[in-house]
């Protein structure tokens, strides 16, 4: 006898005109997420999702492509203004914000939320090249 499958109801996310843009830029990858004011994810993208591999993932061009992909989906759903929260030391932070603006979403604020240690964990040792 076959098991009965229960159809799960897809969660509906409310899209407002205003929202939040989160850019997480590490040394290896760039992740761009657009949420509504409650923090529910509307669209997301990363440079790895766009097809970039290895060291090409942390380039300003990869950040532009990821931000453009993420912003187009949010723009089509009706988002027009965002606050940008930028986290991390990587490349492509400014170019991602510029690309979101070029898609047609107005960036009202840019806030740097990079965590700074108060002498916490020991950092990785420097490379000898």
Curated annotation (Swiss-Prot):
Chain segments annotated as coiled-coil in the UniProt record: none
Any one GO molecular-function label of the UniProt entry: structural constituent of ribosome
Top-rank taxon, per record: Bacteria
GO cellular component, one term: ribonucleoprotein complex
GO biological process: translation
Database matches in Gene3D superfamilies: Ribosomal protein S11
SUPFAM superfamilies the record matches: Translational machinery components
Subunit structure comment from the entry: Part of the 30S ribosomal subunit. Interacts with proteins S7 and S18. Binds to IF-3.
Function: Located on the platform of the 30S subunit, it bridges several disparate RNA helices of the 16S rRNA. Forms part of the Shine-Dalgarno cleft in the 70S ribosome.
HAMAP family, per the entry: Ribosomal_uS11 (MF_01310)
Protein name: Small ribosomal subunit protein uS11
Organism name: Azobacteroides pseudotrichonymphae genomovar. CFP2
Underlying gene: rpsK
């Amino acid at each position: 006898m076959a098991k009965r499958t229960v159809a799960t109801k897809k969660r509906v996310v409310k899209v407002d005109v205003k929202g939040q843009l989160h850019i997480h830029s590490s040394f290896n990858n760039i992740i761009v997420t657009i949420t509504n004011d409650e923090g529910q994810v509307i669209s997301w993208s990363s440079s790895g999702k766009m097809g970039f591999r290895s060291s090409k993932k942390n380039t300003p061009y990869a950040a532009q492509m990821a931000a453009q992909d993420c912003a187009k989906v949010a723009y089509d759903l009706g988002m027009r203004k965002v606050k940008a929260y930028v986290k991390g030391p990587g490349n492509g932070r400014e170019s991602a914000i510029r690309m979101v603006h070029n898609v047609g979403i107005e960036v009202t604020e840019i806030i740097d939320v990079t965590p700074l240690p108060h002498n916490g964990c020991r950092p990785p040792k420097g490379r000898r090249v």
